[in-house]
Amino acid sequence: MFRYYKILLILSLVMISSCDSMKSISSKYNILYNGDLFLNEGIDQLRNSYKDNFWDIIPVIVDNNITNSLPEYPTKNFLKSEEKAIKVIQKMGDYRNSASNYINDAYLLLGKSRFYDKRYISSLQAFNYILKQDVKSNIWLEAFYWRTLIYINLQQYELAKSSLEKELEDNKISKRNLSLLYDSMSELHYKKGDYPALIKSLKKAVKHSSSQEQIRRSYFIIAQSFMNLNKNDSASVYFQKSIDTKANNFSDIYLDANLKLSLLKKQELDEDYFNRMLRQPRNLMASSKINYYYALNSYEKGNYNDSEIQLKRSLKKIDDDKNLKVKVYNKLFEVNFDRKDYLSASNYLDS
């Protein structure tokens, strides 16, 4: 009888201990969840304020280029998510097995919080905790991805390249993770301004990507890179690929791909092409840019009067695009200079 009660007592203690452990893990999961909320709120603020500069070649990875998009940086969000991650790490540091995933999640949250707050060295320390482990799990590869971006941002290009090349030799990496690695390699070539290598890398990234939005972006950057290399026939092919991608046709990239293509196919397009674009409600906020490309098309065909009309229409509608305003004034100068109206041309020279 005594033995029976002894067994019951031991089982009860084990159950109580297990319940306490599960409650602790559950509590830390809630902390991580709240930390992710703070992190994502800060990231969303940055993404919503970020705008691609289509007058230059756009970056491959948006999230690696959004940290300067707000004058009032959302540091508070990232500090709060960092605090949540540290709290989990401190309270679960002695747990093993069932808790290890939570520890890794906490270090990943810690690294990302510091990354978006532009504290790259301390972010690197957090990711290295995960990367020192032997098992190449999905979270390991995600930490590797973020570490690579840190190397790129610190201009440690050779270190980023060598580590990526070594990792890409692993034929067991999933398609999704291969896409991340090739995007990282492409971002590296973008930052270095190595456009032939960027084209080559992005073509590989597209083969492994499941995101139609990222595929459209990759095709667009390939086309921009070909234009930069004066390979306009190839650029036309990839602008068309970007347009044909089954992604959101209300995106800025979709519009700009059509406009860039109009430059390369100027003899094939007439005023109806641009008027149709101007009539579409989705292009209402971009009418100044459409008028500008309309003007370029007319100018290339020698229709200087039509070009001037469209340039002046563009000028009336420009909001905060300083690059566009400069281009419009420069083109107005050219139009009047070519017509030998030097007095009118001089009015735009210093505008």
Where are these regions (language model features)?
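Bacterial N-terminal signal peptides that target proteins for export
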Residues: 1-8
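Acidic, polar-rich low-complexity tracts and alpha-helical solenoid repeat scaffolds
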Residues: 2, 19-351
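Bacterial N-terminal signal peptides
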Residues: 8-16
